[in-house]
Amino acid sequence: LKHAPAIIILVIHFLIFAIVNQFLNPHPDMLDHWVWSRYLSLSYYEHPPMIAWLIRGITLIGGNTETALEVGSQLLTISIIALTYAGTFRLYGTKAALVTLLILCSMPYFTLGSIFLHITQPFLIFWVAALFLLIRFHQQPEKKWLLWIGIAAGLGALSKYIMLLFYLGLFIHLLLYRKTRKEILNPWLYAAGIISLAIFVPVLLWNAQHDWISFRWQLGKGTSGADFGENTLAFTLGHLLLFSPLWALMGGLGSGG
């Protein structure tokens, strides 16, 4: 019963935004990806294929309806929050995990951002999973955790290209963390990378057949153009607000006043 409060919070969160969804028009991005799911491919011009594959699976199970996608979106959001809760509980115990859960449930990303399916949801599931698997490896340095990291990172890369930066962060982390610096030479770390690469092969094959258009578009979008860097401040502030728990704090202060 020690997880009962967390389960209640997650159920309430799900019900609130599942109901809110019924009064909103579907988001254009979700509709775009819904179209992708009707024409399955190894990858797509804008993004890797996970979101399209996921939507196809959801519609096969729940029907080809907006409601099925909206419920699927809520379940993905709940999965991210629950996974983070579980990892925090394992590391720091019930109190810290519950506080983490409440903070996540107060963030606009996990409230308003849960009303439509988008590519970041599966990406975050695999990123969080890979992160906690890395922590588990530090606690219990067995090769199986590295291999699971390889699977999680590969699936994350099938969801969003930025997951490829996980390995960059991992190597920097190992170099800076003296106790695990020797793991740079661990062959199982590179086996994990090979697993990730194998999972990512569909994207590579599709891009090879299409003149690497997706990679070229992503790189061009981020590093070129007359307005490059122009909106950096707005982008940064926007994301800080999107992932900020200040909304809950402001609400608490308001109700207290």
What are these regions (language model features)?
Residues 3, 84-106, 125:
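Transmembrane-helix signature of polytopic, membrane-embedded enzymes
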Residues 9-10, 100-105, 153, 157:
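Short helix- or helix-capping micro-motifs
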